[in-house]
A protein has these predicted regions:
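Acidic catalytic/metal-coordinating carboxylates
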Residues: 36-37, 61-66
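Conserved acidic segment of CheY-like receiver
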Residues: 2-17, 21-25, 38, 53, ...
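Recognition helix of helix-turn-helix DNA-binding domains
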Residues: 160-193
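Active-site beta3 strand of CheY-like receiver
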Residues: 48-55
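C-terminal output helix
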Residues: 88-90, 107-118, 167
Length: 209
């Protein structure tokens, strides 16, 4: 299946700059969606669409930082490149603390923006890949029975069947059967692989109480 084409979301309330930057980015080979009003972008934003956001810092109704804050409240991790008419250090620091991937002045050369966009798109690609892997692991965990999840939690800590049996108050041979099913459903053959899945899955991976 062909991956969807990333979109460069360009938000700037100055029409002339919006048009000029949009034309330059299209000439560089990007697919661009232009928004003169940040509220319009927020209303139409679809987190399923890959890409990045090139965002004017100083807008009248909603500032770039306001947009960044609202996206964060939505749980979005869309990469943001801020660009501003002036190099304001406090604003730049606040933007970067909020997770922006870059901060450029509007006087910066076009090549700098293109490079920043490529960096942001690579960041977005990797983040989406990690989410897909995490969702796949969670789907595997969801296929386990409650007892298998308990065994999984113990196996992931490196415990032997005998130790797991004692902890769960069951026979060692029963644990062996459950362990085999767990490994098969999780698609792994070793504890090391299981621990790698746990690291990718994060806090939703079953743990021993």
């Amino acid at each position: 299946m062909t991956a969807p084409t990333p979109i460069i979301f360009l938000v700037d309330d100055e029409a002339a700059i919006l048009k000029m930057v949009g034309l330059r980015l299209r000439a560089a080979g990007f697919v661009v969606a232009e928004f003169a009003a940040p509220a319009e972008f927020l209303a139409k934003y679809n987190p399923a669409v890959p890409g990045c956001l090139v965002l004017d810092m100083e807008m009248e109704v909603l500032t770039g930082l306001d947009v960044q804050e609202q996206l964060a409240a939505l749980g979005s991790d869309l990469p943001i490149i801020f660009y501003s008419g002036r190099a304001d250090v406090p604003m730049c620091v606040q933007a970067m603390k909020g997770g922006a991937v870059d901060f450029l002045t509007k006087s910066a050369c076009h090549e700098d923006l293109v490079l920043a966009i490529h960096k942001a798109l690579e960041y977005d690609r990797k983040a989406r890949q990690k989410r897909l892997e995490r969702d796949f692991i969670r789907a595997r965990i969801a296929s386990l029975t409650p007892r298998e999840r308990m065994v999984l939690a113990h196996v992931a800590t490196g415990k032997l069947n005998k130790q797991i049996a004692a902890a769960l108050g069951t026979a060692e041979k029963t644990v062996k059967v459950h362990r085999g099913r767990v490994m098969a459903k999780m698609g792994v053959v070793s504890v090391a692989e299981l621990m790698q899945l746990a690291a990718k899955c994060g806090s939703t991976f079953p743990t021993v109480d």
